[in-house]
């Protein structure tokens, strides 16, 4: 039955952030209840003696990856860009404790792109990341699709979460 199947798992976490150099109220530290939908695709396993028979991925295995790479890192944290001056980032750490510094402006759009890289690199062979949907509020979200990013993956080199164009090196 070699059908390609998509499977999706939902995760939630609480996170605060501040947008460096932003001209609106989101420049202030504020928080959201995020919801992340992770969609993978692949062929269900066809090995009758394997306990994972019939699965694209065991949802508990996907949960372990996302929990370790996303939820445990970002839940109940304050996320700020390294672009803030060191005095401010030190202050965030002193005031809030769990502060995560990232190499980008921590918008919903940039977060979902970062999360895609963190998840995709850990998926088992034969299973691919199809898409992510990150809700920042009940009515606002950003989406990442593998199909939309195939061309850019060959023209960009990734260094952590900071992307540099080949012609900029």
Model-based region annotation:
Residues 1-169:
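Charge-rich, low-complexity N-terminal segments
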């Amino acid at each position: 039955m070699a059908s390609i199947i998509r499977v999706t798992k939902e995760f939630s976490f609480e996170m605060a952030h501040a947008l460096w150099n932003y001209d609106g109220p989101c420049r202030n530290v504020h928080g959201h209840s995020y919801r992340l939908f992770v969609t993978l695709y692949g062929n269900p396993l066809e090995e009758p003696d394997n306990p994972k028979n019939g699965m694209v991925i065991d949802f508990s295995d996907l949960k372990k990856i996302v929990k370790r790479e996303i939820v445990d890192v970002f839940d109940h944290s304050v996320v700020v860009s390294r672009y803030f001056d060191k005095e401010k980032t030190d202050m965030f750490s002193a005031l809030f404790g769990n502060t995560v510094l990232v190499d980008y402006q921590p918008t919903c759009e940039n977060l979902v792109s970062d999360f895609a890289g963190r998840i995709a690199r850990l998926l088992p062979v034969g299973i691919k990341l199809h898409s992510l949907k990150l809700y920042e509020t009940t009515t606002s979200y950003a989406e990442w699709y593998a199909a939309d990013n195939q061309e850019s993956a060959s023209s960009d080199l990734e260094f952590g979460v900071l992307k540099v164009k080949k012609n900029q090196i």
